[in-house]
Swiss-Prot record:
HAMAP family: Smg. The lineage of its organism: Bacteria, Pseudomonadati, Pseudomonadota, Gammaproteobacteria, Alteromonadales. PANTHER family: PROTEIN SMG. This is Protein Smg homolog. NCBIfam families: PRK03430.1. It comes from Shewanella sp. (strain MR-4). It comes from the Bacteria. Belongs to the Smg family.
Amino acid sequence: MFDILMYLFENYVHSEVELLVDEDELTKELTRAGFHQSEILKALTWLERLAELQEGDKPYLCNHDQHSFRIYTKEEMEKLDVECRGFLLFLEQVKVLNVETREMVIDRVMELDEPALILEDLKWVILMVLFNAPGHESAYEQMEDLIFEQPEEGRLHS
């Protein structure tokens, strides 16, 4: 399923090509690209649920304390290793993510059928969430820079 999400993001969203609106046409396109029907349906459901998160009726998106500390569940820790959780904390500290977008990311990560996520895949999920979160254009651009601008070899600081 994650491969399909990446395919859609790279070929439609990130390339600024208009995403096909008709789900049947999109399914046919993905089938022609070599993806299986069951995985296509999972990916489309994942995207629909991402869009639903923007409605803000999830309890974790309301009435939060900006200074609270996130405690991960056992299942979340199995899917997000220490490196991934540390990266989420880093993104909050540098204001790329806030409490709401962090929770959206965790929600979407937990919906993936991967047993565990590597940091590179987490970065793409974060990018997808920020792209779909109105009012977070600056955070999206910062995240995009973190993904695409690799530091020069042997150079840690500017």
